């Protein structure tokens, strides 16, 4: 069952305010995945590591000169169909939220699962993302 929209609005807004496009439907996901160039998809979540590390780390990394052509998010536990459709694009990767996936021309080139977000700080995660942006974007 999805979370209350009132509960998660601040969690959505934290990314949207940084320019991240929300993918609310399977069609939104499919349209994004057809785009050429580099794409970062954030699997957003209500958990503490999303609040303390993932969202702040993404926001910090997006200030880098080099960044993906497209940046979007799905919200696990809320936008169930969109999240399932996104996960169908990475079938060999177990579901993980929060998580981050970087694609280049539709091919997954970098993935950060929850266990590589937990226990870190936002600066460390941002540094990892900036390294990937510098390499692939």
Can you describe what each PLM-predicted range is?
Residues 24, 73-75, 102:
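Structural signal for conserved beta-strand scaffold positions within catalytic alpha/beta enzyme cores
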Residues 31-65:
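Local sequence-structure signature of Cys/Sec-based thiol-disulfide redox active-site neighborhoods
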Residues 83-97:
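Short acidic (Asp/Glu) patches
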Residues 7, 11-14, 59-68:
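Short helix-loop-beta junction
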Residues 1-37, 136-137:
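N-terminal leader/targeting and pre-domain segments
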Residues 51-56, 83-84, 122-123:
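Conserved strand-to-helix beginnings and helix N-cap segments that scaffold or border functional pockets
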Residues 43, 66-85:
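Thiol-based oxidoreductase modules, predominantly thioredoxin-like and allied folds used
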């Amino acid at each position: 069952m999805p979370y209350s929209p009132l509960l998660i609005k601040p969690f959505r807004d934290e990314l949207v305010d940084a320019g991240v496009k929300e993918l609310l439907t399977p069609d939104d996901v499919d349209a994004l995945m057809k785009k050429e160039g580099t794409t970062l998809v954030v699997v957003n979540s209500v958990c503490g590591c999303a609040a303390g590390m993932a969202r702040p780390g993404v926001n910090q990394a997006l200030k880098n000169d080099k960044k993906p052509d497209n940046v979007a998010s799905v919200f696990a536990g809320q936008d169930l169909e969109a999240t399932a459709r996104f996960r169908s694009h990475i079938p060999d990767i177990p579901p993980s939220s929060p998580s981050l996936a970087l694609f280049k021309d539709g091919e997954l080139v970098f993935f950060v699962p929850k266990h590589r977000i937990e226990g870190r700080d936002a600066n460390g995660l941002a540094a990892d993302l900036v390294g990937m942006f510098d390499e692939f974007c």
